[in-house]
């Protein structure tokens, strides 16, 4: 279970097309190619010794169709699960983080704000808000014991954090209870202390105590072994600011005024019946989502309680819109995005990059292009600088036409203690982890 994705990278515009800053040949991003490059670049001494001891797909097993799909290790009796926490180095101690407490929430927020994932050039760092963290960490049926901190014994300062939340994820035809592992963060000055492996083992132990034996997680780095590798795409909403802060660059033969004109959007959504989601829409949205997600090889298994928590709009956290037929009043289409700003490091004029991230979208009557263009319009109205999307589900069908450009960030998806016989294409994945 692992560190989350890095902030999406930069995008370069060229003439009236959008091209990536670090071009990748599409055929070169297959899982086998990525793994081969990884293995070629790693000496034997640097291989992932920790992950080789864990029940995860191993690089050496890729292509071995004799291995069964499903759990790698069987569930063990709860009485045999280690009852005491794993030992930390003597100067540290475990703490359980109560996200209902304002003080505790502030501690977690500040740790992440100052030490969480940065882009490769150290220009941007994720800045999850306190409201976002409470939303992400307190879904229906959450376990406070899965919100795990590490303190320095002497100063009592929070120096590391890892979290899990319960989820139901369908893998092929089987719905599996899992933990979604996220927000693994160790203070920058303690990165050499090998805290992460023991934190991963501890959250795994606590998950096992609730009789859950599988997990899902993402990382911006390659570990053994991704079930799929997704590409980040970015759509400029405020191109001047994005260029000024170094997120994107002015393309060859492009002026700033031409670039602004290229990305200009209408002032209001154009789809009749397009409106903000309300509590009364939860049953209809749940039906739409369940039907849509059923076509993907791995997907989240939403019920109404999940939809109410994850998709009802929350200011500066998550936005959801739908199309209600003016004639029948049926809910026919749905789009959503969550708010994840990044701190801009070392820029004298700007401190925050406001980014929207595509979440779950379903189009049945409205064209997907028109639905997502309306999502871009409302995100621009709400002051976002950029709209980000992964090439999961059917997202690839709108990315190029709506002027998204591929970034240099990739996100690898993993399952813990569950083997897939073959890797998925991004378009076969119906799961978005925050």
From Swiss-Prot:
Residues that, per the record, bind tetradecanoyl-CoA: 48-51, 184-186, 192-196
Compartment annotation: Cytoplasm
pH dependence (UniProt free text): Optimum pH is 7.8. Active from pH 5.5 to 8.5.
Cited Gene3D superfamilies: 3.40.630.170
Modified residues (N-acetylalanine): 2
Entry annotated with the keyword Oxidoreductase: no
Pfam family membership, one: NMT_C
Xref: InterPro entries: Acyl_CoA_acyltransferase (IPR016181), NMT (IPR000903), NMT_C (IPR022677), NMT_CS (IPR022678), NMT_N (IPR022676)
Reactions catalysed: N-terminal glycyl-[protein] + tetradecanoyl-CoA = N-tetradecanoylglycyl-[protein] + CoA + H(+)
GO biological-process terms attached to the record: embryonic shoot morphogenesis; N-terminal protein myristoylation
Active-site residues annotated for this sequence: 434
Tissue expression remark: Expressed ubiquitously, with higher levels in young tissues (at protein level).
Keywords assigned by UniProt, alphabetized: Acetylation, Acyltransferase, Cytoplasm, Transferase
Source species, domain of life: Eukaryota
Protein family membership: Belongs to the NMT family.
PANTHER family found in the cross-reference section: GLYCYLPEPTIDE N-TETRADECANOYLTRANSFERASE 1-RELATED (PTHR11377:SF17), N-MYRISTOYL TRANSFERASE (PTHR11377)
Function noted in UniProt: Adds a myristoyl group to the N-terminal glycine residue of certain cellular proteins. Can also use decanoyl-CoA and lauroyl-CoA as substrates.
Name recorded for this polypeptide: Glycylpeptide N-tetradecanoyltransferase 1
The organism of origin for this protein: Arabidopsis thaliana (Mouse-ear cress)
């Amino acid at each position: 279970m692992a560190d989350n994705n890095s902030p999406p990278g930069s995008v370069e515009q060229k003439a009236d097309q959008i091209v990536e800053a670090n071009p990748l040949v599409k055929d070169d991003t297959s899982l086998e190619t990525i793994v081969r490059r990884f293995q070629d670049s790693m000496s034997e001494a640097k291989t992932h010794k920790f992950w080789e001891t864990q029940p995860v797909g191993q690089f050496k097993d890729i292509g071995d169709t004799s291995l069964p799909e499903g759990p790698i290790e069987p569930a063990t009796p709860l009485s045999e699960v280690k009852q005491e926490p794993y030992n930390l180095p003597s100067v540290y101690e475990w703490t359980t983080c109560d996200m209902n407490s304002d003080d505790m929430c502030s501690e977690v927020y500040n740790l992440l704000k100052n030490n969480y994932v940065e882009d490769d050039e150290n220009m941007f760092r994720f800045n999850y808000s306190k409201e976002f963290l409470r939303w992400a960490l307190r879904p229906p049926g959450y376990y406070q014991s899965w919100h795990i901190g590490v303190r320095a014994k002497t100063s009592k300062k929070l120096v590391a954090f890892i979290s899990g939340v319960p989820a139901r994820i369908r893998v092929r035809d089987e719905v599996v209870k899992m933990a979604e592992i996220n927000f693994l963060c160790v203070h920058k000055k303690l990165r050499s202390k090998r805290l992460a492996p023991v934190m991963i083992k501890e959250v795994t132990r606590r998950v096992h105590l609730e009789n859950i034996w599988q997990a899902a997680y993402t990382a911006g780095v390659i570990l053994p072994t991704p079930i799929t590798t997704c590409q980040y795409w970015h759509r400029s909403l405020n191109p001047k600011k994005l260029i000024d802060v170094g997120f994107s660059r002015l393309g060859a033969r492009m002026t700033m005024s031409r670039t602004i004109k290229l990305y200009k959007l209408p002032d209001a959504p154009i789809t009749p019946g397009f409106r903000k989601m309300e509590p009364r829409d939860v049953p209809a949205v749940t039906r739409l989502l369940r039907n849509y997600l059923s076509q993907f090889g791995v997907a989240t298994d939403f019920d109404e309680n999940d939809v109410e928590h994850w998709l009802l709009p929350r200011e500066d956290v998550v936005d959801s819109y739908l199309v209600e037929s003016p004639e029948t009043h049926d809910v026919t289409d749905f789009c959503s995005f969550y708010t994840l700003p990044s701190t801009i490091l070392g820029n004298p004029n700007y401190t925050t990059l406001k980014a929207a991230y595509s979440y779950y979208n379903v189009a049945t009557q409205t064209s997907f292009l028109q639905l997502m263009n309306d999502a871009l319009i409302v995100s621009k109205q709400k002051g976002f600088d950029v709209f980000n999307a992964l090439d999961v589900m059917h997202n690839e069908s709108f990315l190029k036409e709506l002027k998204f450009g591929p970034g240099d960030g990739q996100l690898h998806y993993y399952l813990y203690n569950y083997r897939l016989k073959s890797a998925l294409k991004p378009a076969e994945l119906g799961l978005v982890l925050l």
